[in-house]
Amino acid sequence: QSLYALDKELNGNEVLYLNLHPVSQSTVNFGDFKNIKPFPSNLDTYDFLNIADCLVSDYSSVFFDFACTKKKIILFTFDKEEYLRDRGLYISLDELPYPQVSDYKALLDEMRAEKNYDDTEFLQKFCPYDNINSSKQLCDQIILGKDCGLKTESMPNNGKENVLIFAGNLAPNGVTASLRNLLTLLDKSERN
């Protein structure tokens, strides 16, 4: 019901792209809405988020990545008590600088308001290495052994060979499930 009410309140130049959990996706008929659209499945999530004016998230960790854009983040915590009771969080919501709203009217007001919070401390804590060269710096430091000023922690030497497995984006599909099953079968007595 809230989605219908929110859609009616959105102006012609306001579009809300909704990325629902796959289980919930079939419960929403996007054809009923004028300004609420399904999140594009044919585009990379982060590429699409780069063009967004703001991010509305529940308890998903996507806001950690989006924070690097320094654009507005809104936490939609309509089911906070239930979520905290049933699932819990790694970080208290009170430690986050982002506005929290629990109903569609407050969400709409917050979406239309300017960013009015200081996320400097959050960015320093969780995104200290965010810059245009961060991937190069990480590779240079880890692969080439260059000191790029990145904080690292050495693994204790247990005499075993270290193996790095790159498995793509670990999308929720059969390939990822097979990889996870395979990893449980590996003999870890000779290699890390």
Model regions and ranges:
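N-terminal strand-loop element at the rim of the active site
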Residues: 169-172, 185, 189-192
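Short hydrophobic segments within beta-strands
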Residues: 19, 76, 166-167
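Catalytic binding pocket for nucleotide-activated donors in carbohydrate/polymer assembly enzymes
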Residues: 27-34, 61-127
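C-terminal amphipathic helix plus adjacent low-complexity
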Residues: 105-168
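Catalytic donor nucleotide-activated moiety binding site of glycosyltransferases and closely related
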Residues: 3-40
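A short, glycine/small-residue-rich beta-strand->loop->alpha-helix junction that serves as a flexible
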Residues: 167-180
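Short acidic alpha-helix that forms the nucleotide-activated donor recognition element
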Residues: 43-51
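Acidic donor-binding loop of glycosyltransferase active sites
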Residues: 50-61
